[in-house]
Every structure is written in structure tokens, then in C-alpha cells.
């Protein structure tokens, strides 16, 4: 997929090993199916092993010194740190994404998510913010609206994916630790936020997604936010492929 090129930065928002139905997505009008894996069926040891495989592959297909952002909830802090041990050269920072509104929950409703920032391998990493001398004043508390904040586009985001990340949040992370033209890799594409953010910041995006539904979701979101047309490897447009596959289903052909 990468054509032999190594990614300059990773932004990963993988599953948190919690159910989507009744936990992340409520019982209202907008409902979502479960992710392909890691939706509560894994033990702590199994989830740690799952995360370690992800991280090892991220390290394998990225440049030395690259910065890797991994999103996670507070309940799985131990698993993600244990998974990273021995894979990454350094645990650079723990970022708190502070949202406008709290999500579901009973004993203190959660109004934040965590982003674990690691450095892969030796070598110098990219730091475009420093101490603010470049005009980018950055701390480890990031305040961005969550998907449930009342705003323009809220309904579309909630309908597209149960855990949509804020586009500006990901774009700022990309601006922090990569340069124009760099390749940004997302191993869990989901709603396609990283691809859209890479485009808007002058980078190139590459992403992996297991669920065909969210492959389509990510491509549609990228096209909508960028004005680009998605082209299949065989030269057909996204709409043409969709029309062909619909026709195949209707005629009973695989």
C-alpha cells in the first residue's frame, strides 16, 4: 500500500476494546454496528497483544524518529503502555483531549480522551512547535469540540461513525510533527479524519480499514471535505465502482 515508502508520522485511533452498542453509541435514532474487532471480547492480555502487533507494524512501516499518536481511553492506560514497552524508543507525552461536552457514563461522565505520543526508533524527531517561537503555542491539553457538541455538521459526523475524531485536532497534530509532502499513516481509518487532515495540511495520507462500510465512509468524507474524486486502482471513480457493485448485487453476480 505504501509503495515501499516509510510513513513520516502515525495517527492511530484504534478500537478501545469496549462495545459500541450501548457504550459508545446510544439507543437513540443514530445507531452503529460493532467494529470488526476489539469491542470488548478481548481479555486485558489479549488486548495488549493486539495493540503490540499494531505498534510493531506502525514502527516497521515508518521512518526512524517518527512520532506516533495513539488514541485510547483512560481505562486501558495499562494495556497501551505495556504494549508500547519494547516497541517504541520513548514515551514522549500524554495529551489530554478536553471536549466541550461529556459523553455517556454514570460515575463522572467522561469529557476527555487520551492521546499517547511515542517516538519510534532513534534519530531526530520533527518538532514544528518548540517553545512557541514558531508561532505554534502547544501544550499537552488540547481543547477541541467532540462529536456530540452542537455545531454545524454534528448530525453528519454522528451518523457517519461512532467515534469521529475532530478534524482540526488531527490536522494540528500533523502540523506539529511532520512536514509538507510527508506521508501520514492511519492504521484504523474509520471515518477518514486522518486522510482529510493530511490533505488539508499539504501532506499525503495512507490508511487501512477492515470494515467495508467505513472504507466507503472515509472515502466519502475525504471527497466531501477536499473536493477530490476517489479513483480506484483500475481507473474507475468511486461512484462508478459503487454503481457497478450495486448492479452486480441486483443481478446476483459476485
Language-model features: where?
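Core catalytic lobe of class I
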Residues: 1-215, 253-254
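S-adenosyl-L-methionine
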Residues: 1, 219-254
Amino acid at each position: 500500500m505504501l509503495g515501499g515508502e516509510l510513513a513520516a508520522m502515525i495517527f492511530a485511533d484504534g478500537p478501545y476494546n469496549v462495545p459500541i452498542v450501548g457504550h459508545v453509541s446510544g439507543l437513540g435514532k443514530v445507531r452503529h454496528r460493532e467494529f470488526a474487532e476489539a469491542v470488548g471480547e478481548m481479555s486485558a492480555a489479549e488486548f495488549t497483544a493486539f495493540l503490540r502487533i499494531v505498534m510493531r507494524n506502525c514502527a516497521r512501516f515508518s521512518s526512524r524518529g517518527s512520532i506516533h499518536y495513539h488514541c485510547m481511553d483512560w481505562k486501558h492506560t495499562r494495556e497501551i503502555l505495556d504494549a508500547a514497552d519494547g516497541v517504541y524508543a520513548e514515551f514522549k507525552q500524554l495529551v489530554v483531549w478536553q471536549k466541550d461536552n461529556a459523553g455517556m457514563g454514570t460515575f463522572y461522565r467522561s469529557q476527555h480522551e487520551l492521546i499517547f505520543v511515542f517516538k519510534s526508533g532513534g534519530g531526530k524527531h520533527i518538532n514544528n512547535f518548540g517553545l512557541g517561537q514558531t508561532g505554534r503555542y502547544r501544550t499537552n491539553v488540547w481543547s477541541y469540540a467532540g462529536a456530540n457538541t452542537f455545531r454545524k455538521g454534528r448530525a453528519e459526523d454522528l451518523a457517519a461513525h461512532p467515534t469521529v475524531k475532530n478534524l482540526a485536532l488531527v490536522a494540528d497534530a500533523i502540523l506539529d510533527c511532520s512536514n509538507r509532502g510527508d506521508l501520514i499513516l492511519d492504521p484504523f481509518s474509520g471515518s477518514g479524519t486522518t486522510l482529510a487532515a493530511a490533505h488539508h495540511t499539504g501532506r499525503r495520507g495512507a490508511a487501512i480499514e477492515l470494515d467495508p462500510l467505513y472504507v466507503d465512509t472515509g472515502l466519502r468524507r475525504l471527497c466531501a471535505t477536499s473536493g477530490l474524486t476517489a479513483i480506484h486502482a483500475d481507473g474507475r471513480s468511486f461512484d462508478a465502482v459503487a454503481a457497478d457493485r450495486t448492479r452486480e448485487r441486483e443481478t446476483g453476480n459476485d
